[in-house]
Amino acid sequence: MSELKTVGLFAITALAEIVGCYLPYLWLREGKSIWLLVPSALSLVAFVWLLTLHPTAVGRVYAAYGGVYVTMAILWLWAVDGIRPTTWDILGTSVALLGMAIIMFAPRNT
């Protein structure tokens, strides 16, 4: 799988997890409808399924996925919560993505 496809798959996986966790938050903290749990459950099922599509050992996938999750969470902060990321948010995201790239794309024998 190409690097671009791998990163895209990580991004879609992270979005599914964030949506799956955000909807119950809206129900519990914001008083929204309990029916939000239905799309939340579907989103989390999609998240788990998407994890199975990643092209490498599961431990490596989880470790690398963390970097993309951090990035998606900061983008969510900006797009959904309306809070502009700080310089430190961007720096931390960059470090997390660098770690993801090293884990996923470093040359290895196995």
Curated annotation (Swiss-Prot):
It is found in: Cell inner membrane. Its main location: membrane. It comes from the Bacteria. The chain crosses the membrane at residues 7-27, 33-53, 63-83, 87-107. One of its GO terms (cellular component) is plasma membrane. NCBIfam families: PRK02237.1. This is UPF0060 membrane protein Pcryo_1341.
